[in-house]
UniProtKB/Swiss-Prot annotation:
It is found in: Cytoplasm. GO terms for cellular component: cytosol. HAMAP family: Nuclease_YqgF (MF_00651). PANTHER family: POLYNUCLEOTIDYL TRANSFERASE, RIBONUCLEASE H-LIKE SUPERFAMILY PROTEIN (PTHR33317:SF4). Could be a nuclease involved in processing of the 5'-end of pre-16S rRNA. Its main location: cytoplasm. This is Putative pre-16S rRNA nuclease. InterPro entries: RNaseH-like_sf, YqgF, YqgF/RNaseH-like_dom, YqgF/RNaseH-like_dom_sf. It comes from Citrobacter koseri (strain ATCC BAA-895 / CDC 4225-83 / SGSC4696). Keywords: Cytoplasm, Hydrolase, Nuclease, Ribosome biogenesis. It is an enzyme of class 3 (hydrolase).
Amino acid sequence: MSGTLLAFDFGTKSIGVAIGQRITGTARALPAIKAQDGTPDWNIIERLLKEWQPDEIIVGLPLNMDGTEQPLTARARKFANRIHGRFGVLVTLHDERLSTIEARSGLFEQGGYRALNKGKVDSASAVIILESYFEQGY
């Protein structure tokens, strides 16, 4: 086991991507993947899996602030199930509440409004999701 994890911040137009190491508990953003109504180019995901060979995939689970599910929750679950079904890799869903707000805030501090492009925000959110997963001791 390499201790490498790949995280996705699911969205209907863009899917953020991050790579991380369990041993260091750190993650970094990779380029976001464009999606058409939530469907990614599966060849890109396959290339990511071949390149990074993760032990586990983390998919952010969008929930309302009170913990209830929202319309995007079922779509994120379906995306996670498809990854597992297509590639046979362990996939874990992880609460992503506030990750996009935190990502936008951090990117704005670094570069103002110009830093807030959709792909950067989505991949920064994937970093936050993965680091949160590490912080919870997984």
